[in-house]
Amino acid sequence: MSTTSSHSNVVGVHYRVGKKIGEGSFGMLFQGVNLINNQPIALKFESRKSEVPQLRDEYLTYKLLMGLPGIPSVYYYGQEGMYNLLVMDLLGPSLEDLFDYCGRRFSPKTVAMIAKQMITRIQSVHERHFIYRDIKPDNFLIGFPGSKTENVIYAVDFGMAKQYRDPKTHVHRPYNEHKSLSGTARYMSINTHLGREQSRRDDLESMGHVFMYFLRGSLPWQGLKAATNKQKYEKIGEKKQVTPLKELCEGYPKEFLQYMIYARNLGYEEAPDYDYLRSLFDSLLLRINETDDGKYDWTLLNNGKGWQYSAAKQHVVQRRHTQGTNNRRQSTIPPYARTRQNLLSSPSKQTPVNNVVDASVATQKDGIPGKAASPQVQQQQQTSSAQQQQPQRVEQPAPQTTQPTQVDTQQAAKPAPSKEKSRKKFHLRLLSCCISKQE
């Protein structure tokens, strides 16, 4: 049963919905506030008609992992009208976002500090009997801006996580082959490309690919072309196999090569030595006369003002450009058309100021003013947005030729313009939330 109020825009009894800050294959993401303690929250909406619903499984996984450092808390799961709703902690930007702000290169010091946190995060997940299976920069976020945890790296989006052993008996899942591809092709392990059952070693290898991506700016298997997605994934896997680790890590601190060699030589059921892996990056910091002081590249931007200043500055430029474009478009429309267009686009006076979705997509056809537009419209918006964004994960049997649900399509050096726009909007809204909270 829906608990949404058409006047106060409250869901789940005491969660007020604010501005939309993102969307993807899962659905839509909004910022909001817990009316009991005034805590900022994130609300994820997923169509109940989704062919592959994920929010319920994600909620259950979060509940099993809750309490671990770097794992966001979840507060509510339920149904709101035509949507499933998950309420959780509101966090900051992803490592992919911060990578863009830093010119698509991180310093060895920053990558070493990131590596230590990511290793610890994945170790915690493994100790709860899960493997992540979709390691990528987009799935690791820093804490809420201005909070005590603003530089803590959080692991999010456990839609593809899987138990690798029985939590009661601790018996490991048996080794299998001819498995489906699960993960993001750019970062997945060689064994995953070969259709082998994933285990803890595959998470570690994927992390190594992420570390080298941060250092290099791109990976050798990006930008490969093929007639079909299946052929493209095969090409990516082949390129990974024929690229020597020395060549992949050439010109960068030796500790990254040592990490990759260790990860690729782990056995299927072998327990990783996480302490050893962290010690590699402690040694690196010591060798380059640095310390793990929490001063990441993104905190040093703009003479120490940080990434927030870049986000706000870029949004002002984007907003001016958008306003200029809209004005030029209006000048080309006949007066009668402009009048009719404005009438059609103007929200009803009965529509609340803060809608569950933007006013431009809220309609009276949905029954209650302020409710989301029809699931069909939202599904089309989600699909078009997901296709334009960063490398997307694959979950498809390797021998089949059917179209995967998500494709690794991002060009490494130049992100797609649509992705840039959505990211800038995200950061402005996040900043406005921070400012209003401080006031």
From Swiss-Prot:
A GO CC term attached to the entry: cell periphery
Protein kinase domain residues: 15-286
Active site: D134 (proton acceptor)
Region entry Disordered, spans: 366-426
Top-rank taxon: Eukaryota
Alphabetized InterPro entries for the sequence: CK1_Ser-Thr_kinase (IPR050235), Kinase-like_dom_sf (IPR011009), Prot_kinase_dom (IPR000719), Protein_kinase_ATP_BS (IPR017441), Ser/Thr_kinase_AS (IPR008271)
Reactions performed catalytically: L-seryl-[protein] + ATP = O-phospho-L-seryl-[protein] + ADP + H(+); L-threonyl-[protein] + ATP = O-phospho-L-threonyl-[protein] + ADP + H(+)
Amino-acid positions noted as binding ATP in the UniProt annotation, renumbered to this chain: I21, G22, E23, G24, S25, F26, G27, M28, L29, K44
Family affiliation: Belongs to the protein kinase superfamily. CK1 Ser/Thr protein kinase family. Casein kinase I subfamily.
Location in the cell: Cytoplasm
GO biological process terms, semicolon-separated: endocytosis; negative regulation of establishment of bipolar cell polarity; negative regulation of protein localization to cell tip; regulation of endocytosis; signal transduction
Native organism: Schizosaccharomyces pombe (strain 972 / ATCC 24843) (Fission yeast)
A Pfam family recorded for this sequence: Pkinase
Stretches that traverse the bilayer: none
One function term, GO molecular function aspect: protein serine kinase activity
Gene: cki3
Protein's job: Casein kinases are operationally defined by their preferential utilization of acidic proteins such as caseins as substrates.
UniProt keyword Translocase, yes or no: no
Gene3D superfamilies per record: Transferase(Phosphotransferase) domain 1
Protein known as: Casein kinase I homolog 3
